[in-house]
Amino acid sequence: RPSYALTKNFAGVYILFNQSKNMYYVGQGKQVLNRVNAHFTGKGNGDVYADYKYGDSFTIKMIALENSGFDTLNELERHTIARYNAFSKGYNKTRGNRN
């Protein structure tokens, strides 16, 4: 099960990397730790959860909005999805913000 060294939630984006399939999922949240946890407890992206449940290994990276160079979570998320090809070659179903 995931364990987090961080104990304080923050606004930002998170990158879930499926090491077994070389696929990314990028999401955003005002409380990033809660959003990350949702994906591994069946309350987030169903495909991510299914792969995790059946044994795929994941790594997690989180980027705080503060000092990221972006003004909004939407901008940071869109940029991160594009950077990791999470829409074209990953789990993301949109290019960001449900667009």
Where do the protein language model's features map onto the residues?
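Short, solvent-exposed coil/turn linker segments
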Residues: 1-2, 53-54, 64, 85-86
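GIY-YIG nuclease catalytic motif and its immediate N-terminal context
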Residues: 1-34, 38, 71, 75
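Generic serine detector
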Residues: 3-5, 20, 57-59, 68, ...
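Conserved short loop/helix modules at catalytic or binding sites
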Residues: 30-75
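Coupling/hinge elements of helicase-like and P-loop NTPase modules
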Residues: 84-99
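Serine endopeptidase catalytic core focused on the charge-relay Asp
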Residues: 80-81
